[in-house]
């Protein structure tokens, strides 16, 4: 037969064969979280959840031993100082490269201002409300600052999630603001909300400054500088503005140690996350701190949680779900060789 002749069995050069199908990949090779998704997950699990314990534990230490906010800030800053050993082992300068040292100090100063305002607010305002105001203001300010200074826009889903977080903030804090007591108590409560708001603004600006720092040991350097700046500022202020108090019982010491460790973990995770994802989205995901703080406020501090608090926390969780689902993308790791 003609088809059996070698001439007819040769491939037709005028009609090239279709390209071969790409090799099949395992499920863990086909799909992996993007950088933005990884950053948001780290912010959610490592930044927001541990930070939710900090406010209630700080309030417990204050109720048990009347521990002032500046002293609690000093104890927390002490947990940052051992990072100097890591920098020395790596051969990195403790204060960062000389050309960006001033920005690193400014970032550390903003972090300390944010933390100090948060610790002061949680002593006069319920822990959940203080966390809500701080995270809500940081979310809004991060979105505005990043849009104006970095020209980094957000998608429609991201804006929907941000607006949802703000709505949750209004639902939680709104009823409390309308029922402020007259006199000294009402003034202190209003000042507590103002401190929480200013703490959120300082946090958003600090995250933006941190994103502008580009050197290998950026995170440990800023963490060490935050502890150093916090000690230099809060130790003199403690003796001038407040009265030093030594924790008197095991509960107070346990709260102080837990606050220092959990706050350092949250600080590290947020610093990593903000280099991977939009600062406004990171701040929005950190609203998980509000949910944890409200739960601990009810079960540990035995403080009343209003229905509006539960509703606002639900709205915030739904907004976090929208942002996370929007950024939950997959990247193919295998490339077909041509």
UniProtKB/Swiss-Prot annotation:
A single GO cellular-component term from the record reads:
membrane
The family database entries (SUPFAM superfamilies) matched by this protein are listed as: Multidrug resistance efflux transporter EmrE
Q: Where are the transmembrane segments?
A: 37-57, 67-87, 105-125, 160-180, 190-210, 221-241, 250-270, 281-301, 305-325
Claim: Cell membrane is one of the keywords in the record? no
User: InterPro entries given for it?
Assistant: EamA_dom
Keywords assigned: Membrane, Repeat, Transmembrane, Transmembrane helix
Q: How does it sit in the membrane?
A: Multi-pass membrane protein
One Pfam family this chain carries?
A: EamA
Q: Which residues form the EamA domain?
A: 49-174, 272-325
Subcellular compartments: Membrane
The segment annotated Disordered runs over 1-24
Q: Which domain of life is it from?
A: Eukaryota
- Entry's family note: Belongs to the SLC35G solute transporter family.
**Other known facts:** The gene encoding this protein appears to have arisen by SVA-mediated retrotransposition of the SLC35G6 gene in the primate lineage.
Name of protein: Solute carrier family 35 member G3
Identify the species of origin: Pan paniscus (Pygmy chimpanzee)
Q: What is the lineage of its organism?
A: Eukaryota, Metazoa, Chordata, Craniata, Vertebrata
Q: What gene is this protein a product of?
A: SLC35G3
């Amino acid at each position: 037969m003609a088809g059996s002749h070698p001439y007819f069995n040769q491939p037709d050069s005028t009609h090239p064969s279709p390209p071969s199908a790409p090799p099949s990949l395992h499920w863990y090779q086909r799909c992996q979280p993007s950088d933005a998704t990884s950053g948001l997950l780290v912010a959610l699990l490592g930044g927001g959840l541990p930070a939710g314990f900090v406010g209630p534990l700080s309030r417990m230490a204050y109720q048990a031993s009347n521990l002032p906010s500046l002293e609690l800030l000093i104890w927390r800053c002490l947990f940052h100082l051992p990072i100097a050993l890591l920098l020395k082992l790596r051969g990195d300068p403790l204060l960062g490269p000389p050309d960006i040292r001033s920005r690193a100090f400014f970032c550390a100063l903003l972090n300390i201002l944010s933390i100090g305002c948060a610790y002061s607010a949680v002593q006069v305002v319920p822990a959940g409300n203080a966390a809500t105001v701080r995270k809500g203001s940081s979310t809004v300010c991060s979105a505005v600052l990043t849009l104006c200074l970095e020209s980094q826009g957000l998608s429609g889903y991201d804006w929907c999630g941000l607006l949802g977080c703000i709505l949750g903030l209004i639902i939680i804090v709104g009823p409390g603001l309308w029922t402020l007591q007259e006199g000294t108590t009402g003034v202190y409560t209003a000042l507590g909300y103002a401190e929480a708001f200013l703490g959120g603004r300082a946090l958003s600006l600090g995250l933006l400054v941190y994103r502008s720092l580009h050197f290998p040991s950026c995170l440990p350097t800023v963490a060490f500088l935050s502890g150093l700046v916090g000690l230099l500022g809060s130790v003199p202020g403690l003796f001038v503005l407040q009265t030093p108090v030594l924790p008197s019982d095991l509960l107070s010491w346990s709260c102080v140690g837990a606050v220092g460790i959990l706050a350092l973990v949250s600080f590290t995770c947020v610093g990593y996350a903000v280099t991977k994802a939009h600062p406004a989205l990171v701040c929005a995901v950190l609203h998980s701190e509000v949910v944890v703080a409200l739960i601990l406020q009810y079960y540990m501090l035995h403080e009343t949680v209003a229905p509006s608090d539960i509703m606002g926390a639900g709205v915030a969780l739904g907004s976090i779900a929208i942002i996370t689902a929007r950024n939950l993308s997959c990247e193919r790791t295998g490339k077909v060789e041509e």
